[in-house]
A protein has these predicted regions:
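Glycine-rich beta-strand-centered segment in the early N-terminal region that forms part
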Residues: 19-35, 48-95, 129, 134-137
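Residue-level marker of beta-strand positions
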Residues: 61, 80-81, 96, 122, ...
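Mid-domain Rossmann-like dinucleotide-binding core that forms the NAD(H)/NADP(H) cofactor-binding site
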Residues: 82, 135-215
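NAD(P)H dinucleotide-binding glycine-rich loop of Rossmann-like/cofactor-binding domains
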Residues: 90-168, 195
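C-terminal hydrophobic helical "lid"/dimerization subdomain
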Residues: 183, 236, 280-334
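Glycine-rich cofactor phosphate-binding loops and adjacent beta1-alpha1 units
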Residues: 189, 197, 201-271, 330-333
């Protein structure tokens, strides 16, 4: 099979021909149709996340069809359309796993980081961490739901019942969260890179009541701000935009250092919280919710061979919505 592989950090991905992997007893073999490109992939390629498996097939927003199941698999059968997210496996026995917080499991293994992911024609995944995809989405349209959607969903739940919601960094996750927030009756206030009129117009099309530069304040104090951009300097700015009792939710897996800020902008029972990974419950809830909203993903589809171009465009902030790699032709070899 064709695959795009990371062989060293800070280097472009390399095209390789790899054997089709074989599923273990609790795994499924999936013919990959589409894999969305996530900022986490970029952090791995750019060496900002330590010690990935090398060589590595990146990608953790995978949609495809089950080809083969391991002998212990009971929840999936060949032919089912499934999605595979970032959380690849957990121990199931630690305090976190036993209390519904498997996203914090110290033994967790992640797709496209510790385990080979979806930048390939086929992949194997734990059946317990693979989810049937419903709704009228094409495979490419469904792919961003598997991380941009899931992490966005978890961030929105952390924001509680916030009515006035700010979103900083209006990309793949934000454009999904905005739709869900509007469905829930919230006001969306979108913050973009200064001067990014295209992103601000995109946010308004998705129902934002206000869209402006990240270094400006919204017309009214907000109940919550979700930060998707990996920029630590946005944290103090988000605090300044909050009403007393509000919360800043940091949704990225990596962020530059947060600069010092005066206690006065935190005072008033304002809070800062990070979101780490996701749980299977998050996946089940969101994948059931998305068709009801309905969430519509804005995608740019590229062939798998252009994975480096997709990463470059993401790094440069040139994408609205999400880039998705078409992996169907990559099954032909191997």
């Amino acid at each position: 099979m064709h695959a795009m592989c990371l062989e060293a950090a800070h280097r472009p991905l390399v095209a390789r021909e790899l054997p089709v992997p074989e599923p273990e007893a609790d795994e499924v073999l999936i013919a990959v149709s589409a894999c969305a490109v996530c900022r986490t992939d970029l952090h791995i390629v750019d060496g900002e996340l330590a010690e990935p498996k090398l060589p590595l097939v990146p990608g953790h927003e995978i949609v495809g069809h089950v080809v083969e199941v391991g002998r212990e698999v009971e929840n999936l059968v060949p032919g089912m359309r499934v999605g595979v997210p970032w959380l690849g496996s957990t121990c199931g026995a630690c305090t976190y796993c036993r209390s519904g917080r498997e996203n914090l499991c110290p033994s967790a293994r992640f797709t496209g980081y510790h385990r080979d992911g979806g930048y390939a024609g086929y992949t194997v995944a734990k059946a317990a961490y693979s989810f049937e995809i419903h709704g009228d989405y094409s495979d490419a349209e469904a792919a961003p739901l598997l991380c941009a959607g899931l992490i966005g969903h978890r961030c929105l739940r952390q924001a509680g019942d916030a009515r006035r919601l700010g979103i900083m960094g209006f990309g793949a996750a934000a454009h999904i969260v905005a739709q869900v927030a509007r469905f829930e009756g919230r006001e969306v206030h979108a913050f973009t890179r200064p001067g990014d009129a295209t992103a601000q117009a995109f946010a308004r099309r998705l129902g934002a009541v206000w869209a402006g530069d990240a270094d400006t304040l919204p017309p009214q104090p907000l109940d919550a701000v979700i930060i998707f951009a990996p920029v630590g300097a946005l944290v103090p700015q988000a605090l300044r935009a909050l009403a007393p009792g509000g919360i800043v939710v940091c949704g990225g897996i990596h962020m530059s250092d947060i600069p010092s800020f005066p206690y006065s902008i935190l005072w008033g029972e304002r809070r800062i919280v990070s979101v780490a990974n996701l749980t299977r419950r998050d996946a089940e809830e969101f994948l059931a919710l998305a068709p009801r909203v309905p969430v519509r993903t804005d995608i740019t589809v590229l062939p798998l061979a252009e994975a480096n171009l997709a990463l470059d465009r993401l790094r440069a902030g040139e994408l609205s919505g999400a880039a998705v790699l078409d992996c169907r032709a990559s099954r032909d070899a191997g």
